[in-house]
């Protein structure tokens, strides 16, 4: 918004206003703005959620026993705070004429709406059964398919239907008409992967922040022909503005972590986890680094695989591979304390983020 106002009404002779033309300046401002919004709205919103929800998020009876004692009464739907900060900051600092920004914003909002409906039904019914799996996946598939097709229409023709591989600078796999389906699987998959990971205080939000930092840099590089050519990346004009979105996501995530750090004052709920995962998937599709997201977001991938393996093996043999799935609950059952699990998973995410950055140079 500010960028568009200055572009159309600002004076080229005012040096300070020229700062708004730089993505790096607006990205930094977006991060700080989102952080400020989160910190300012956090306490009032949490107080309001406590008044409305009273008993807090329903706790799964089959989950770790201590969750019933320690987490009962904690309000959920904290994802509303993340989305408010993310959208407010992005709309303020991003170039709103950029199609990629709108495609990612609306995909994020759509996943957030599905998560909000799921949280609302869980609270109103006072159990952990929200929107039916079929309805939930149907809505996610529809939103991600539209988002994927939208972003495909914005891409250069020589990239639009192709899949790029990390470490390989030249080779592209042509997907043809299947690309929107691939985008749908990527976005929906990561939406649910973050949802699976969000089971302990602070566990999901820090890996999301790390992924947003990495993809903020990637979007800046692939959106700039000079940097893309130097690093031998596939340039995607227009995606540089997603750096502003990613920076806003970092700020919103840090602000939420202020209240979600153990012991959490609020949970993000499906409102937050689905929207954040959907956002990461959409950004990866836009910048043609979907497989790099599997590296950077490897923690989310492993958590999801633990659920798939557990369900498949139990249905096949009647036995469990893990003490409990997702994986973080397995370690809880083994006797690890929650802070140890969370911090060690954060360390893994940092290492995976660095590995993702390494793919930009090792080509």
Swiss-Prot record:
Keywords: Cell cycle, Cell division, Cell inner membrane, Cell membrane, Cell shape, Cell wall biogenesis/degradation, Magnesium, Membrane, Metal-binding, Peptidoglycan synthesis, Transferase, Transmembrane, Transmembrane helix. Coiled coil: none annotated. One of its GO terms (cellular component) is plasma membrane. GO terms for molecular function: metal ion binding; phospho-N-acetylmuramoyl-pentapeptide-transferase activity; UDP-N-acetylmuramoyl-L-alanyl-D-glutamyl-meso-2,6-diaminopimelyl-D-alanyl-D-alanine:undecaprenyl-phosphate transferase activity. Its cofactor is Mg(2+). InterPro entries: Glycosyl_transferase_4, PNAcMuramoyl-5peptid_Trfase, PNAcMuramoyl-5peptid_Trfase_CS. The chain crosses the membrane at residues 27-47, 76-96, 97-117, 137-157, 171-191, 202-222, 226-246, 248-268, 271-291, 292-312, 340-360. Its EC number is 2.7.8.13. The keyword Cytoplasm does not apply. GO terms for biological process: cell division; cell wall organization; peptidoglycan biosynthetic process; regulation of cell shape. Pathway: Cell wall biogenesis; peptidoglycan biosynthesis. Its main location: membrane. It is found in: Cell inner membrane. It holds the Pfam family Glycos_transf_4. It is an enzyme of class 2 (transferase). Belongs to the glycosyltransferase 4 family. MraY subfamily. This is Phospho-N-acetylmuramoyl-pentapeptide-transferase. It comes from Gluconacetobacter diazotrophicus (strain ATCC 49037 / DSM 5601 / CCUG 37298 / CIP 103539 / LMG 7603 / PAl5).
């Amino acid at each position: 918004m500010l960028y568009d106002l200055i572009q159309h009404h600002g004076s080229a002779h005012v040096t300070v206003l020229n700062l708004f033309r730089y993505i790096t300046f607006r990205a930094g401002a977006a991060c700080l703005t989102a952080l400020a919004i989160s910190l300012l709205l956090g306490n009032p919103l949490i107080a309001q959620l406590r008044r409305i929800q009273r008993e807090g998020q329903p706790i799964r009876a089959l989950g770790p026993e201590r969750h019933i004692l320690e987490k009962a009464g904690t309000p959920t739907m904290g994802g509303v705070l993340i989305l408010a900060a993310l959208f407010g900051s992005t709309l303020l600092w991003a170039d709103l004429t950029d199609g990629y920004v709108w495609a990612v914003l609306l995909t994020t909002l759509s996943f957030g709406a599905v998560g909000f409906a799921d949280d609302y039904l869980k609270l109103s019914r006072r159990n952990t059964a929200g929107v039916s799996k079929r309805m939930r996946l149907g809505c996610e598939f529809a939103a991600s398919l539209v988002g994927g097709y939208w972003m495909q229409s914005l891409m250069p023709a020589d990239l639009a239907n192709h899949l790029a591989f990390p470490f390989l600078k030249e080779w592209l796999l042509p997907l043809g008409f299947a690309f929107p389906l691939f985008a749908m699987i990527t976005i929906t998959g990561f939406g649910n992967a973050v949802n699976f990971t969000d089971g302990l205080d602070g566990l999901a939000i820090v890996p999301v922040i790390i992924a947003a930092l990495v993809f903020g840099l990637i979007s800046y590089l692939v959106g700039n022909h000079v940097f893309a050519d130097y690093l031998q990346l596939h340039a995607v004009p227009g995606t540089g503005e997603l750096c502003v979105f990613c920076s806003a996501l970092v700020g919103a995530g840090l602000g939420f972590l202020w209240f979600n750090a153990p012991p959490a004052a609020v949970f993000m709920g499906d409102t937050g986890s689905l929207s954040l995962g959907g956002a990461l998937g959409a950004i990866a599709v836009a910048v043609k680094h979907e497989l790099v997201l599997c590296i950077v977001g490897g923690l989310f991938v492993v958590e999801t695989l633990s659920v798939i393996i557990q369900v498949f093996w139990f249905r096949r043999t009647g036995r469990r591979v893990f003490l409990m799935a997702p994986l973080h609950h397995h370690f809880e059952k083994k006797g690890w304390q929650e802070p140890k699990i969370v911090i060690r998973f954060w360390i893994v995410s940092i290492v995976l983020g660095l590995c993702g950055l390494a793919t930009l140079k090792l080509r």
